[in-house]
């Protein structure tokens, strides 16, 4: 029996999860939540979902009504991560979140508290950890092949792709919603 997964936030990032899950027999996207019906429709179509999935405008309705879920993948804007994650963690479900965990220290602490008090599990999507370029750098550092690291310069060179993401997702431009450019774009450099 496949794990039943809910997707909260059905914008562009969620499509990557859907594509990965389509290749697996042990995971099934059974529920979508997003206030944007067009996003839900696009996600369902691209994920190849049939009529046997549920969709919701409000994630709270989904949390209340969908009692057989095995986990939640949260692809909502950063400022909503804490609210979404805490709801699912308090129900005892594991959650996967896109980076960053949340845009503020207190929101991060609240997620961690919910995880600890409910014996929960949280995965943060730092996908660059497995990118060949970064794994090679990590290997060179770990093996000591480039000497002692005393300084790192990590330049984020935005191209057309980054510009289109910012235009498509205008919330990313506002620090109170995204956490600012260090959390939104450069957190992967800090993670490394």
Language model regions located:
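Predominantly a Rossmann-like dinucleotide-binding segment in NAD(P)-dependent oxidoreductases
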Residues: 128-192
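Short, Asp-centered acidic motifs that coordinate Mg2+ and/or phosphate
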Residues: 31, 70-71, 151
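Beta-loop-alpha module in the N-terminal Rossmann-like domain of NAD(P)-dependent dehydrogenases
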Residues: 11, 17, 53-114
């Amino acid at each position: 029996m496949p794990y039943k997964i809910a997707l909260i936030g059905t914008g562009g990032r969620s499509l990557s999860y859907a594509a990965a899950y389509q290749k697996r027999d042990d995971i099934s996207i059974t529920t979508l939540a997003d206030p944007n019906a067009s996003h839900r429709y696009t996600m369902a179509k691209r994920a190849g979902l049939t009529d046997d999935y549920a969709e919701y405008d409000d994630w709270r309705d989904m949390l209340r009504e969908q009692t057989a879920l095995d986990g939640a993948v949260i692809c909502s804007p950063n400022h909503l991560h804490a609210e979404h994650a805490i709801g699912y963690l308090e129900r005892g479900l594991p959650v996967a979140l896109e980076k960053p965990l949340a845009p503020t220290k207190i929101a991060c602490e609240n997620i961690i508290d919910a995880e600890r008090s409910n014996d929960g599990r949280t995965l943060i999507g730092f996908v660059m950890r497995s990118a060949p370029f970064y794994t090679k750098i990590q290997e060179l550092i770990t093996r000591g092949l480039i000497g002692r690291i005393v300084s790192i310069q990590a330049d984020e060179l935005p191209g057309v792709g980054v510009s289109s993401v910012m235009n498509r997702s205008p919330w990313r431009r506002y620090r109170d919603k995204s956490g600012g450019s260090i959390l939104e774009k450069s957190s992967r450099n800090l993670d490394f």
